Amino acid sequence: MADTHKISFEPVDIEMEVGEDETILDAAFRQGIHLMHGCREGRCSCKSYMLEGDVQMDDYSTFACNDAEEAEGYVLLCRTYAYSDCEIELLNFDEDELLGGAPIQDVTTKVAAIEPMTPDIVSLKLDVVEPESVEFKSGQYFDLFIPGTEDKRSFSIATTPATPDRLEFLIKKYPGGLFAGMLTDGLSVGQEIKLNGPYGSCTLRNGHVLPIVAIGGGAGMAPLLSLLRHISETGLNRPVRFYYGARTAADLFLLDEIATLGEKIDDFSFTACLSESTDNAPEGVTVIGGNVTDIVNDNEADLARTEVYFCAPPPMVDAALALAEQHSVPHDQIFYDKFTSPAFDS
């Protein structure tokens, strides 16, 4: 059995134990403590600060924590192993979420439907079998296990807690992706898929009132659609401006539902941002040619007075992070998911 150590978190006065064979983040999940996190792969800069203790970090992106930050004492808890008792300062946390998040659990589901949305994005709908329903928040994600293997991939939920027994995921088919071939040929209705989760902090915060600027691209539509569905269902009174980046009009989807959801939100706008061509643009939709982050920059002069949510391929996420920094958006007003895929792994 691995040695265990005590971890103390400041300024929230929470303590827990961690084994030397698990990351601090995984130990927190195991004990019902929901620390701020995103990708869980050391790529998305959810940093904390070491006040005292002996730790080591596994492989991580220097974009998330550069050498100077690491030397100063910053750590990524998803990659950090403790080898002594430690005191850690949490730099970005939600007190309501810390001890009140949805429990991490193993879930058994069966495929209910597989439906193409665009030439390279598929809707995968799953019926929850065990337990009978799952608890999660709009904007979170699950790990899906490749049937018959221990391999897994993270996908955001497009549905809301209003349907805890039916989950929908929007999955982009990358060449060489483990799920890509299965979605095209190999996965069938009724087949069992194991899940684990929910994870992620790209969720709406209780009591927050700032306008929401949502920036999406590709399968990053999923968590933003979940947020829109939730706002529409609950009547939450917050302005929402949704910018979706795609290459051409053929890459746009769910436009009718987005329009319907928007009608139920007091102050809502949707802009399709097409980087390659605006030919054959759909009627009744605001379409602008160009990169989505450039278009947001041109249209959101007061971005720092909004809460920014984004989920997209890694290059678009990096561009959105740079945009938020350029506009001096406070870190606690930025929420995002940054998943990797075979197309972007280095």
Swiss-Prot record:
The entry's function note states:
Reductase component of the propane 2-monooxygenase multicomponent enzyme system which is involved in the degradation of propane via the O2-dependent hydroxylation of propane. Reductase catalyzes the transfer of electrons from NADH or NADPH to monooxygenase.
* Cofactor note as given: Binds 1 2Fe-2S cluster.
Entry keyword Iron-sulfur = yes
State the family named in the UniProt similarity comment for this chain: Belongs to the bacterial ring-hydroxylating dioxygenase ferredoxin reductase family.
Q: What happens when the gene is disrupted?
A: Cells lacking this gene are unable to grow on propane and to catalyze the oxidation of phenol to yield hydroquinone.
- The FAD-binding FR-type domain covers which part of the protein? 104-205
Domain 2Fe-2S ferredoxin-type residues, every copy: 5-94
Q: Which cofactor does it need?
A: FAD; [2Fe-2S] cluster
Q: What is this protein called?
A: Propane 2-monooxygenase, reductase component
PANTHER family, A to Z: NADH OXIDOREDUCTASE HCR (PTHR47354), PROTEIN RFBI (PTHR47354:SF5)
The protein's UniProt keywords, in alphabetical order, are: 2Fe-2S, FAD, Flavoprotein, Iron, Iron-sulfur, Metal-binding, Oxidoreductase
Short name of any one Pfam family annotated for the protein:
NAD_binding_1
Q: Which organism is it from?
A: Gordonia sp. (strain TY-5)
Q: Which PROSITE patterns match?
A: 2FE2S_FER_2 (PS51085), FAD_FR (PS51384)
Gene from which the chain derives:
prmB
Q: What induces it?
A: By propane and acetone.
| EC class | oxidoreductase
Residues that hold [2Fe-2S] cluster according to the record: C39, C44, C46, C78
GO MF terms on file? Answer: 2 iron, 2 sulfur cluster binding; metal ion binding; oxidoreductase activity
Question: Subunit notes for this chain?
Answer: The propane 2-monooxygenase multicomponent enzyme system is composed of an electron transfer component and a monooxygenase component interacting with the effector protein PrmD. The electron transfer component is composed of a reductase (PrmB), and the monooxygenase component is formed by a large subunit (PrmA) and a small subunit (PrmC).
What EC number(s) has UniProt assigned to this enzyme? 1.18.1.-
